[in-house]
UniProtKB/Swiss-Prot annotation:
Lineage: Bacteria, Pseudomonadati, Bdellovibrionota, Bdellovibrionia, Bdellovibrionales
Function, in words: Allows the formation of correctly charged Asn-tRNA(Asn) or Gln-tRNA(Gln) through the transamidation of misacylated Asp-tRNA(Asn) or Glu-tRNA(Gln) in organisms which lack either or both of asparaginyl-tRNA or glutaminyl-tRNA synthetases. The reaction takes place in the presence of glutamine and ATP through an activated phospho-Asp-tRNA(Asn) or phospho-Glu-tRNA(Gln).
InterPro entries given in the database record: Asn/Gln-tRNA_amidoTrfase_suB/E (IPR017959), Asn/Gln-tRNA_Trfase_suB/E_cat (IPR006075), Asn/Gln_amidotransferase (IPR018027), Asn/Gln_tRNA_amidoTrase-B-like (IPR003789), GatB (IPR004413), GatB_C_1 (IPR042114), GatB_Yqey_C_2 (IPR023168), Gln-tRNA_amidoTrfase_suB_CS (IPR017958)
Uppermost EC category: ligase
Any one biological process term the GO annotation gives: translation
Origin: domain of life: Bacteria
Subunit text: Heterotrimer of A, B and C subunits.
Record-linked SMART domains: GatB_Yqey (SM00845)
Official protein name in the record: Aspartyl/glutamyl-tRNA(Asn/Gln) amidotransferase subunit B
Pfam families in alphabetical order: GatB_N (PF02934), GatB_Yqey (PF02637)
Assigned EC number: 6.3.5.-
Reaction catalysis annotation: L-glutamyl-tRNA(Gln) + L-glutamine + ATP + H2O = L-glutaminyl-tRNA(Gln) + L-glutamate + ADP + phosphate + H(+); L-aspartyl-tRNA(Asn) + L-glutamine + ATP + H2O = L-asparaginyl-tRNA(Asn) + L-glutamate + ADP + phosphate + 2 H(+)
Family: Belongs to the GatB/GatE family. GatB subfamily.
Species this chain originates from: Bdellovibrio bacteriovorus (strain ATCC 15356 / DSM 50701 / NCIMB 9529 / HD100)
Molecular function as annotated in GO: asparaginyl-tRNA synthase (glutamine-hydrolyzing) activity; ATP binding; glutaminyl-tRNA synthase (glutamine-hydrolyzing) activity
Amino acid sequence: MSSRGYEAVIGIEIHVQLSTKTKIFSSESTAFEAGDNENTSPVSVGMPGTLPVLNSKVVEYSIKTGLALGCDIRRKSVFARKNYFYPDLPKGYQISQYDQPICENGSITFKVDGKEKTVSITRAHMEEDAGKSNHHGEYTLINYNRSGIPLLEVVSGPDMRTPQEAAEYARTIRQIVRYLDVCDGNLEEGSLRCDCNVSVRKEGAKQFGTKVEIKNINSFRFVEKAIEYEIERQIDCVERGDKIIQETRLWDPDKNRTFSMRAKEDAQDYRYFPDPDLQPVIVTDSMIEKYKKELPELPIARAQRFQDDHALPELDATVLTTEKDLADFYEDTAKESKNFKASSNWIMTELLRELNSANKNIKDSPIKPAQLGKMIAMIDKGTISGKIAKTIFQEMWASGNDPEVIMKEKGLVQISDPAAIEKLVDEVLAANAQTVEDHKSGKKKNLFGFFVGAVMKASKGQANPDLVNKILLEKLK
């Protein structure tokens, strides 16, 4: 991003809350809706004499995420203690990973404004979450339910230059972890949190400027807005001759600005050292091969397959692969209908509109893929028209019934008998003799659509429109 002769340098740390049933080092539930301090134990609140035991699912989910991000998986990684004091960190240290993380040297590619962008993944490391401080005027309450929740912190390289690239990078990470089913990606509940590191430098300069970290960002729109604000703030500082302080700032969505929170610590301030209570994590080749085989087809590859094998436009393929459940729904529909583009069209227009209007996700759709696929096949066979299909679709949405059942109950079978349609056409032409004369003489133009509409109305929308057009063309010569 070029602004007033400056270039932004952006990196993002994304804390992915892994969807395990229990915490990283203890057996309490990770359920979000639990009451305050309900999901705690002597381990998660740091009582003396307690020992952590690593949850193996955390290792599995971390390796799968690393593989999906193209990372190298360390055969031996080490937990370290990150030492700092804060009321919601009862042990006085956080168990994390430092110089030997489980995943390193990956990258992801995505599109921004139609152009491909590749961002490096420096590392992804396992760690425990801290508790949560709730500030109430003169006092603070602490909820330790979150203490010990398993996180995988995914750290990008400083490769992004615009707020739009940063937001799309974060969206892509969320899309991948949701495809893997290792995180629900709920930003509002904090199961995916973005910390953005921003600096500015003169265009063409090679040296990085002073980095500022922005926290408290809980939507992708705010990722863009917070970075946009911070870029302009830093440029203003430089042009005034002020020194940019290495600090952590909070994004305030109500005021659309960032505020200073605290001076930003360097790694040496945390006095990292290997945790003596935890063994190194040993990853074998057989584990990696097993998890590779269990990986789903990832969104970019799936979208490309939809374009190559199903001849779908890029827009369709991109929309349909936004969520794994949506892509699955499309494939199941197309398998039943044998019509890729029609399946895409019905899902992207009719179904997604109804889902959005009802605030439902694809899993909650009352219309199942097999039902939608059958309805599309009925159109292609000429059993029903597109107009009848829309009526059946609405009935399917309301009742969840199969399209054949609705068609029979409502008498919605398409009339495809040429003799029956010819009879309807003759009746319409006889009832509109003057209009027929006007059409044939050329006195009035563009009347053909009137006759089509009249025949369709007479048939209550059940006449085969192709046959109606064909017979009318013959009779109106």
